Amino acid sequence: MKPVSDGIPRTTSLKGQRGAVAVEMAIVLPLFAILLLGAFEFGDIARTHQVLQNAAREGARFSANKTNWIAGSTDPTVQAATLARIKDRVVAYLQGEKITVNASDVIVDQNYPIAIPGLPGVKGSHITVNYQRSLIFPGITGLIPSAAINLQGNAVFRNFY
């Protein structure tokens, strides 16, 4: 018994397919590379932001314990030295994570109001860390309007004294 043909010619030649695969690869490979590099970039940005948050939290915790050194002292040199120690603590934490910031990028506010119902006048230590991060893969800057991203870490701890 002979099979019935459906009228569509069948060829087993792959000569025409080789060129199509090369064209598809030329289109898909750059898009895949951009997607992969973007994922690495985004992951590192997220890590850097988390490290900034942790550094701000460490500074706020340290500052909350040192509030009475500043508020209880009338000597401006003691107040300035205590603020410098708080900022140095944050900078040292970031240096341990291979992030370089200046002490001027750390903002300390030890009179930050915290709203707690039934407890008026509660103050906290608010630490802000500003950091400008450049991109890992500079070739992506054509896709992103700015070659640097501004990141910020914030933390508030209630003052203990």
Region annotations inferred by a language model:
Residues M1-R18:
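N-terminal leader/signal peptides at the extreme start of proteins
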Residues S13-G16, E24, Q53, I149:
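Hydrophobic residues within membrane-embedded alpha helices
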Residues A20-V21, I27, L36-T67:
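Aliphatic-rich helix starts adjacent to a transmembrane/signal segment
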Residues K2-D6, H49, N54, E58-Y161:
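Short, conserved structural patches
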Residues L35-L36, P76:
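Hydrophobic transmembrane alpha-helices
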